[in-house]
Each structure stands twice: as C-alpha cells, then as structure tokens.
C-alpha cells in the first residue's frame, strides 16, 4: 500500500481543517522544499556564512536565514487565505491578503548556527485564525490554545515534516525523487517516562534553584532519588531536540535564568514555544514555563520570550513541582 501524500492526508482530515487551511499548509510545505534545496546547495551556491547584519532579536543573521525568510514571505503574502504573517526575523508583521482567513507565524530557519557545520536545522510554523478583514498587529495576540495548526520541517539526513491540526501528530518524509511529502507515521506518541534530557549545561550557574535541583538529580542518576541513569543530548536546534522527543521521548529545557533577568527566557513564544507545545501536547506530552502551561499564555508582544520545559509528561510534571 502506497503512502498518502501530504495533500491526500489533509483532504481526509476533519475538525479544524478546512480546505482553505489545507491550502495554506500545502504552500508552507512547498516552500520548505525550496528551502531544503537551498540548504542542499550550501557552499556550492555561496550561501553559507553570515549575512552581515542582525535580526530584530539582536542575533547575527546567516545568509540562509535571510533566504529562507524571503521564500516564506514571498509565498505566503500573496496566498488568498493568509491575512497576515509574522517572522522571527522581522520586527513587524507583514500584511497579506484582505479577508484572508489565517495568520501564519514562523521561524524560517531554527538552529541556523548549525548551518556552517552541516548539522540539522529546521523551519517552525504556527497558524492562527484571522480576526479582521484587514489584519492588525493585535490580531496576532492569541494564546497558543487558539492555534488551528502547527508543525516543523526538519532538514536532516532525510527531510521530514511533523504536523498537527488538532487531531494528533503525523510525520511526513520528503521523497527526494518525486519531491513529495509522504505520510510515514500517524498518531505519534511521546512516552510518559524517559531517561534522556536536553539542556545547555553551560548556563548552569545562571539557573534558578528548582532547575538546578532537577538537573543535579538527573546527573547523579542511580545514586540519587531517581534511582536510574540519564543521558544528556543537545542539538542546538529546537527542531532537532523536539523531533527526538517525539520519536523516543525525553525532556527539553530552556529555562528562565538570571544571566539577563530582564528577559523572561530565550525562546520566542509565538514562533517556537507555542507551535512546539501544540505538537508535544497533541502527542501526549506536556509543556510549561515551569510555572504555567505555555499554551495558555496570553501574549503581549510579537517577539515575547518565555522559558520552555517540554516533553515526556512525567518528567515535565516533576520539574514543575519543584518550582
């Protein structure tokens, strides 16, 4: 039996998935194929390295950050069902089509520091319902519970898409010969327990005490109250770390720290935390800042940052109980 294509899968889905939403998702997938092709060329096309400027986050942009962002902006701003879009790379939102039913938010190339060393990167996207015929900035200020779809594309040894439209999580793999996303896993589930964790341990001295306590217990392994050993993984690309969790369980932490107390966290609520939280929760996992469920946060600004603790439910609940 042949695998369903992404388009065929979307035609069969029900619930929140309207034909218009399916078209938006198809366009995102098609654009990610173009990004994938650019990444494959890399040094051959002279597009590795820095673009020589910073984005709104104060981060140095890679050339492929800019290229990927442009591809998505160009494809979505003319889409008849997209009222507006927002990118992690741009200060303000981009107005799209009048009466477009959906708003699209995205991180065009997550983990771009990995580009020049040929490690995994990804595209993350979130889709919200539009609020007005002509999109306004305030229309994007919706809690993650309002998302109608979320997903990512992982550019790795094989190019894969993880997608939820509010009815579980499915994986699609890009066939390099036909350039078609094919359904390869349905009903993805995150195991409730795990022995893997992902955190940037170089920030340990800046963590709050609850996170310090939790990680110290994991590192102590069998000699601690946990009575089992844990392995640490860190890809420096949220897409890569979350994909691993969806495949075999685990917990990912980018907690609040005291290095810059004015910043609530490192990761962006709208472009990273919300879509990844929807995916993880739809697969049976959990997602929190350590104090509140991420999907229930009412955003106050487009580039709002939050702490993120996400993954296997029992581990997320345990570290939350320490706060």
Curated annotation (Swiss-Prot):
Reaction it catalyzes: beta-D-fructose 1,6-bisphosphate + H2O = beta-D-fructose 6-phosphate + phosphate
Disulfide bonds: none
Keywords: Carbohydrate metabolism, Cytoplasm, Hydrolase, Magnesium, Metal-binding
Gene Ontology CC terms: cytosol
Annotated GO MF terms: fructose 1,6-bisphosphate 1-phosphatase activity; magnesium ion binding
Positions with a binding annotation for Mg(2+) 1: 88, 107, 109
Cofactor remark from the record: Binds 2 magnesium ions per subunit.
CDD domains, per the entry: FBPase (cd00354)
Family of the protein in this entry: Belongs to the FBPase class 1 family.
Family matches, as PANTHER family: FRUCTOSE-1,6-BISPHOSPHATASE-RELATED, SEDOHEPTULOSE-1,7-BISPHOSPHATASE, CHLOROPLASTIC
Name listed for the protein in its UniProt record: Fructose-1,6-bisphosphatase class 1
Organism: Acinetobacter baumannii (strain ATCC 17978 / DSM 105126 / CIP 53.77 / LMG 1025 / NCDC KC755 / 5377)
Gene: fbp
């Amino acid at each position: 039996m042949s695998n369903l294509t992404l388009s065929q899968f979307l035609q069969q889905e029900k619930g929140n998935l309207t034909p218009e939403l399916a078209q938006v998702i198809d366009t995102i997938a098609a654009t990610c194929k173009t990004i994938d092709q650019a990444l494959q060329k890399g040094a051959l096309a002279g597009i590795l390295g820095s673009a020589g400027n910073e984005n709104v986050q104060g981060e140095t942009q890679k050339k492929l950050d800019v290229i990927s962002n442009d591809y998505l902006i160009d494809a979505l701003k003319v889409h008849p069902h997209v009222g507006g879009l927002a990118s992690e790379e741009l200060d303000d939102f981009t107005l799209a089509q009048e009466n477009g039913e959906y708003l699209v938010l995205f991180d065009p190339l997550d983990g771009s520091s990995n580009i020049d060393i040929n490690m995994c990167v990804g595209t993350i996207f979130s889709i919200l319902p539009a609020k007005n015929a002509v999109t306004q900035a305030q229309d994007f200020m919706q809690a993650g519970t309002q998302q109608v779809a979320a997903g990512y594309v992982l550019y790795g040894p094989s190019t894969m898409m993880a997608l939820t439209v509010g009815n579980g999580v499915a994986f699609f793999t890009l066939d390099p010969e036909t350039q078609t996303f094919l359904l390869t896993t349905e009903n993805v589930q995150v195991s409730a327990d795990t022995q893997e964790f992902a955190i940037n341990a170089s920030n340990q001295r800046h963590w709050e005490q609850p996170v310090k306590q939790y990680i110290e217990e994991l590192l102590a392994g069998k000699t601690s109250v946990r009575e089992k050993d844990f392995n640490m993984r860190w890809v420096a690309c949220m897409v890569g770390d979350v994909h691993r969790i969806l495949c075999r369980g685990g917990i990912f932490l980018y907690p609040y720290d005291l290095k810059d107390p004015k910043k609530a966290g490192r990761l962006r609520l709208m472009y990273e935390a919300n879509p990844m939280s929807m995916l993880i929760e739809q697969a049976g996992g959990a997602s929190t800042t350590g104090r509140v469920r991420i999907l229930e946060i009412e955003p106050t600004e487009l580039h709002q940052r939050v702490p993120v603790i996400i993954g296997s439910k029992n581990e997320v609940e345990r570290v939350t109980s320490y706060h």
